[in-house]
C-alpha cells in the first residue's frame, strides 16, 4: 500500500513510481487520496512535474500498444491490444483527474490525456481505412481507445 502524498517531495517520489508503471493501481489510488498545499512556486513545479509524468507514460504506453498491435496475429489479439490501451489511457485519466488539483489545472491535465487518446483513436481509424475488408475499421470503432471517463479509481 502506497501512502497518500502530502508534500512536494512525497508527490515527486510517487510520480516517479507512477512513471515506472510498476504499481499503477496503488499509485493512482494514493495520488487521488493525496493533498498538496497549493502555493506559488510549488503549484507551477508540481503541475509541470505531473504533466511530464503523464506525457512520459503516454509515450511509454503508446510504445507498448504499438508492440501489442504488431504482434497481433488474430482478431482477438487486436481486440485485446485495443482494450489494454483503453485501460492504460483510463489509468492516465484517473491520474490526471486528481482531487488535489484546482479546477483549471485539473482541466488542463485531463485534456492532455484525452487529446492523446483522441489522436490515437484518429490514427487507428485512418490506418484501418486501408483494410479492404472493413473488418479492422469495425474493430477500431467498436473498441475505441478514447472512451476514458470511468469510476474505476474513485
Regions from the PLM with identified roles:
Residues 1-2, 151-154:
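Short intrinsically disordered terminal tails
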Residues 1-43:
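Leu/Val/Ala/Ile-rich N-terminal alpha-helices, chiefly Sec-type signal peptides and the beginnings
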Residues 35-144, 151-152:
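Long, low-complexity or tandemly repetitive, helically biased scaffold regions used
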